[in-house]
Amino acid sequence: MTINSSNIENPPSKINSRFSKLTDYIWPIKRHEVSKFLFITLLMFCILFIQNLIRALKDSIVTTMIGAETISFLKFWGVMPSAFLMTAIYVKLVNRMKAENIFYLIISIFLAFFALFAYVIFPNHEILHLSPVTVQNLTANLLNLKWFILLLSKWSFSLFYIIAELWPNVVFALLFWQFVNNITTVEESKRFYPLFGLLSQTGIYLAGQFLENLSNINDYVTNKFALQSSFHTLSIQIILTIVLILGIIAIKTFWLLNHKVLDKEHMALLKFKAKKKSMTIAESFQMILSSRHIRLIATLLICYGIAINLVEGPWKAAATKIYKTPTEYAAFIGSYLSYTGVFTILFVVLGSNIVRRLGWFTAAVITPLIVFITGILFFAVNNFEGFAGLIIANFILTDPALIAITIGAIQNVLSKSSKYTLFDSTKEMAYVPLDPEIKIKGKAAADVIGTKLGKSGSAFLQSLVFIILPSASYQSISICLMIIFIITCLTWLWATKELNKEYKNSIKFSQ
C-alpha cells in the first residue's frame, strides 16, 4: 500500500480550512445573518440608486433650463438654509414620533414631491413660471439681482434642485445610517460595511448606465404606448417613475426589516436620537485653533470642497454648449457616473495596498495631485485656444468645447474616485493617534468647519462675483477661478505635507 505524500502535506482538513478562509474573505456573512444583510443591502441599493438619478436630473434641469451659473446660488442661498431647517424639523420629529414612522413620513414626503413634479409641475412649467418678457423686464431694472430673479422665475426647477440635494443628507446619511448603525453590532459592522461600500459603487455604475440609455428607453416607451408627451417631459417622467418604484420598494423593505427580519432584541435597540450636544460653530473654531493637527485636517477638507466646486461650475457650463437639453445632459452625466463607479471600485482595490506598502503620505497626496493636474489641464483647454489646438493636433477630438468637457469629466471622475477612497481613508487615519478627547471633538470640529466652508464657501464666492458682475459667465471669469484653484491646490499639497509630519509625531507620542 502506497501513501500519497501530497495527502500528508495537505490533508483534507487543511485544504478545507484554506477554502473556508477564502470563502469567509469573499463572503464574510454568516448563515443566520443572510436575510438581515440582504434586506439592508436592498434598502441601501434603492436609496443610492434614487440618489444618483435625482442628482443627475437636478443638474440636467437647472444647467440646461436656467444656467450653470445659478448652481452656486442654489447651493449657498437655497440648499444650506434648507439643510439647517430640515435638521431642526428632524429634531422635533424625534421627540414626538417613533423611529419607524419618521422614516415612512420623510420618505413619503420626498416621493410625493417627485410624483407631483413629474406629472403636474414639469408638464405645466411654462404656465407656472413667469413669462420670459416679465423676467427680461425685471432683470433690466434690477441687474445685480439677475440670477436671483432667474431662480425665482423658474421656482419649480430651483425647488427640485434643493429637494434633490437634501436626499443624500437626510435619507441616506441620517435615516439609513442611523437605522443600520442601531441594528448592527460592532462585530457585524466589520464584515457588513466593506460590502456596503462596494455595493454603493455598483449602484453608481448601474444608475449611470440607465441614464446613458435614456433616449433609447424614451423611444421604446413612446412607440409601445403611443404617447404624445414631449420628448424631454417623458424623459423626466421615466426617471422619476423609476425613483417612485424604487422608493416604494425601499419603504416595503424597511417594513419587512422591522416586522419580519429583525427580532425583538434588535427592535429594542432601534431609537433615532438627536445627536448629543453637538459642537457649535464657535466651539468648532476654538477646537481647530487650539490644535495644529486638527487645523491641517480642516484645511484639507476646505481645499477639497473649494477645488472641486471651482472646476465643476465651468465644466457644467461648457457641457451645455454640446448637451443642450435635459435628456442629452442626463445621458452625459450617466456616462460620467458609470466611469466614477468603475474607477472607485479600482481605487478601493488599490487603496489599502498603497497605504500598506507606500505609507500614509503617498496615499494622502494622490488626491490633491490628481485634482491639481487634471484641473490645470481643464482650465488650460478652457481658457487658452493655443493649448486646445495643441491637443487637437495630437488627439482624435477636434472640437475645443468637447476637449474641455472630456478633460473636465476625467477630472471629476478621478477626483471623486480618489476622494471616496484614498482621501477619506487617510483623513480618518489622521485622527487615530490623537488623544481620545481631541480625536472626538477634533473630528466633529473639522467635519463641521471643513465640510461647510469647503462647499458653501466656494459657492458663496462664485455667487458674489455674479452679483457684482451680473453680465459675467463662467467662461468670462474662468481665468480668475483658475488662479484661485491653483492657490487652493498648492495650499492643499502643503497642508498634506505638514499633516504627514504631525501624523508621524503623534504616532511616536502615542506609542
Swiss-Prot record:
Listed InterPro entries: ADP_ATP_car_bac_type (IPR004667), MFS_trans_sf (IPR036259)
Keywords associated with the record: ATP-binding, Cell membrane, Membrane, Nucleotide-binding, Transmembrane, Transmembrane helix, Transport
Domain of life: Bacteria
GO cellular component, one term: plasma membrane
GO MF annotations in UniProt: ATP binding; ATP:ADP antiporter activity
Listed Pfam families: TLC
Topology term for the membrane: Multi-pass membrane protein
Record's subcellular location: Cell membrane
Entry's transmembrane regions: 34-54, 71-91, 102-122, 157-177, 192-212, 231-251, 296-316, 330-350, 361-381, 390-410, 453-473, 476-496
Coiled coil (UniProt feature): none
Alphabetical list of PANTHER family matching this protein: ADP,ATP CARRIER PROTEIN 1, PTHR31187
Family: Belongs to the ADP/ATP translocase tlc family.
Function summary: Provides the rickettsial cell with host ATP in exchange for rickettsial ADP. This is an obligate exchange system. This energy acquiring activity is an important component of rickettsial parasitism.
Protein name per Swiss-Prot or TrEMBL: ADP,ATP carrier protein 4
Native source species: Rickettsia felis (strain ATCC VR-1525 / URRWXCal2)
Taxon lineage: Bacteria, Pseudomonadati, Pseudomonadota, Alphaproteobacteria, Rickettsiales
